[in-house]
Amino acid sequence: MNKQPEDWLDDVPENKNDDDDEIIWVSKSEIKRDAEALKDLGTELVDLGKNALERIPLDEDLLAAIELAQKIKKEGRRRQIQLIGKMLRARDVEPIQTALDKLKNRHNQQVSLFHKLETLRDRLIAEGDDAIPTVLELYPDADRQQLRSLVRNAQKEQAANKPPKSFRQIFSYLRELAEKQQ
């Protein structure tokens, strides 16, 4: 058996290809993960309502496939979502993903605003007139008299165990103020 010298690779000519011509190898599992991510994106698109879909930049074929998937149930729906994932692989999904993220973010902002308004309303009812300056500081357009009367009525309703009509009116009023401010 012939033994090769340790420096036998030194005689092999180096590959002089530029880095630009280099082929990037992608593993099979990475391709599968990407395909699964696109299928999940397709599922999210199918779960959206009609109004939300109008805000997302989709071509006619993809929109038709999504609308069809919304009508189908069970196994046919799964196959249709697979098709949508395949269609997404052939498209630039970045604008679609960006629009979807904006929709989700808008929803999250709205939810956090509602929680903030609910906390403010609860504070108004618990503290009464002492909390009104805080509301006026946040919303300078607020009517002090209307706010005070709503708070008093809500406190009376709460004490008498009546339905919380003024309680809801305070929230509606605060929501109107928040919308005007935006």
From Swiss-Prot:
Molecular function as annotated in GO: ribosome binding; rRNA binding
Primary location recorded for the protein, binned into one broad class: cytoplasm
Keywords, comma-separated and alphabetical: Cytoplasm, Ribosome biogenesis, RNA-binding, rRNA-binding
CDD domains registered for this protein in UniProt: YjgA-like
Superkingdom field: Bacteria
One Gene Ontology CC term in the entry: cytosol
Entry keyword annotation includes Lipid metabolism: no
InterPro entries for the chain: DarP, DarP_sf
KW rRNA-binding (keyword) present: yes
Pfam family, one: DarP
Xref: NCBIfam families: PRK05255.1-1
Family: Belongs to the DarP family.
HAMAP family attached to this UniProt entry: DarP
Annotated function: Member of a network of 50S ribosomal subunit biogenesis factors which assembles along the 30S-50S interface, preventing incorrect 23S rRNA structures from forming. Promotes peptidyl transferase center (PTC) maturation.
Name of this protein: Dual-action ribosomal maturation protein DarP
Organism of derivation: Yersinia pseudotuberculosis serotype O:1b (strain IP 31758)
Gene: darP
